[in-house]
Amino acid sequence: MGTDYRNSGRGGRDGPGGRGPGNDRRDSGRSFGDRRPERPDFKRGDGGRGFGDRRGSGPPGGPDRGDRRGPRDGPGGRGGPGGPGGGFKGGAKTMVKPHPKYDGIFISHGRGDVLVTKSLAPGVAVYGEKRISVEGTESKIEYREWNPFRSKLGAAVRLNVLDMPIKPGAKVLYLGAASGTTVSHVSDIVGPTGAVYAVEFSQRSGRDLLEVAKARTNVYPIIADARHPYKYRMIVPEVDCIFSDVAQPDQARIVAENARYYLKANGGMLISIKASSVDSTLKPEAVFAREIETLREHDFKCKEQLDIGEFHRNHAIVVGRFRVKAA
């Protein structure tokens, strides 16, 4: 007679070492995917993110990791609508008020104060940002959260930059537009009467930028090298402001060349400088000082050097005006 293995090793079902009654997976209804204890069912939007939270520590208020990306043109995708999970609705506890210092920028007062811009393309998320729907006098108004950790310009606004030439109706030349994250917020700020001429050299980022422009009639994507501004002179008119984020060793010279072609007298300039991209052998303070001196040599009057290292390590925003006219 053979050995009965059913009662050896792990033990019988109800015996010592066995699963015990009620522990059979078939009886409990639990699958391999259910081994972890269940989490509370947090809804997206139960808790806003304050200025200081880069990614948050999970619910409440944080996006599920599985929801970060969707199909490119589908709900939640970079180039498509954000879908039902792409934003949160404003309610009685959420108030959106104009920024006290900057035209075209707003602050959402809810579970934490958050920078937002009024969406020029309601229903469309650009980089998975949260969206707030607020009841207006005639219809709902959608605002988009502006994350300072994802945008150098957003960081400058969060840190109360002195001069903000980007405002409703402005024409902006944006150098180093990348995938269009900050471009989309600039588009919101300048509104339908303004324009954003977004220059990007990378073909891959340029494709994403084109997707952003499809939903925004005031964005003019230009796939070109910002070192040669004459190549897009047939597209770009005289502008009110230049914002630059090209992260190149000769960035100050690139800005100066573009200003010579397109920036009006007394026009605004904001340049994001990453110290290690200019000269990794020098301390950041020395790099910033050298770039400011280069700008001054090209008719810029620099008004402020703003350290945004709190949001972007070894970065500074230099703010100035071009060919300032004497009073």
Curated annotation (Swiss-Prot):
Record's catalysed reaction(s): L-glutaminyl-[histone H2A] + S-adenosyl-L-methionine = N(5)-methyl-L-glutaminyl-[histone H2A] + S-adenosyl-L-homocysteine + H(+)
Taxonomy, superkingdom: Eukaryota
Listed Gene3D superfamilies: Phosphorylase Kinase, domain 1 (3.30.200.20), Vaccinia Virus protein VP39 (3.40.50.150)
Subcellular location: Nucleus, Nucleolus
UniProt keyword annotation of Transferase present: yes
Subcellular location, principal: nucleus
Protein's GO biological process: box C/D sno(s)RNA 3'-end processing
GO CC annotations, alphabetized: box C/D methylation guide snoRNP complex; nucleolus; small-subunit processome
Top-level EC class as recorded in UniProt: transferase
UniProt region (Disordered), positions on chain: 1-96
Location of Asymmetric dimethylarginine modifications: R10, R19, R44, R49, R55, R65, R69, R78
Keywords: Methylation, Methyltransferase, Nucleus, Ribonucleoprotein, RNA-binding, rRNA processing, S-adenosyl-L-methionine, Transferase
InterPro entries: Fibrillarin, Fibrillarin_CS, SAM-dependent_MTases_sf
Modification after translation, per record: By homology to other fibrillarins, some or all of the N-terminal domain arginines are modified to asymmetric dimethylarginine (DMA).
Record-linked SMART domains: Fibrillarin
Keyword RNA-binding: yes
Disulfide bonds: none
A Pfam family per the record: Fibrillarin
Stretches with biased composition (Gly residues): 73-90
Bias (Basic and acidic residues): 22-56
E.C. code: 2.1.1.-
Similarity comment: family membership: Belongs to the methyltransferase superfamily. Fibrillarin family.
Assembly: Component of box C/D small nucleolar ribonucleoprotein (snoRNP) particles. It is associated with the U3, U8 and U13 small nuclear RNAs.
The protein's name in its UniProt record: rRNA 2'-O-methyltransferase fibrillarin
